[in-house]
């Protein structure tokens, strides 16, 4: 068992891509885990090796999470964990986890969550059932279900003109965001949806065509973003819900996805009732969000 170092990176990247093909091109976090630099102290990586051959890897990130652990200070997220098939059920994963947990406890971290920057927001029950069994054995508990959904765009009526006219009569305007409104969006997210505050730059990086906002009295009260075939995030100020704002923002975003040539929209970490009711979206993946308390809370 070894702490990940820069010399391990080439083999670690190949190992991760083989274990999780979708991570190709998105493995920058490995450099953080291996750097040993103070600014990356919150990125931890362990490898298991047989001689010079890498047979297991475990990476965690330590950060404050206002969604999963509001007001609890830094917690840990499991970014990636994998063991070579030939070395499974030989205690490799258990040893890696026990060493990582000891490190996190020594840092004063109270809990660990199964939320990855590169794989998924939870543990996919269909693809990673073995991982679920392992995590339960290690003391993790299920906290919530997370859904990915999809909707056929060629079967939807996406016109919002009547709904928008009704909102305008109520003093609410829905429009595509302008560059000059990026700071207002950032402030809105920081206040109303702090867990998405970092998305303000991301969702406008390719221009305002990806983002729609709802405004009342000169202030943003809702937003929706899309990227390629993915819809989201979306959010409406709690006091302004149940007025049809969310559905208008949703349909506008789906129109953008259809205009980019996609016949289906994908919705990650979806509010199942809202999307099923609004656009007859169907569930494509169910994940468990799991947590282990390790800090004696």
Placement of each model-derived feature along the sequence:
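Acyl-donor-binding surface of acyltransferase catalytic domains
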Residues: 97-168, 269, 276, 286-295
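A structural microfeature
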Residues: 56, 144-147, 222
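Short, high-confidence coil segments that cap the C-terminus of an alpha-helix
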Residues: 43, 108-109, 262
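Short hairpin/turn module used for nucleic-acid contact or packing/dimerization
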Residues: 242, 255-297
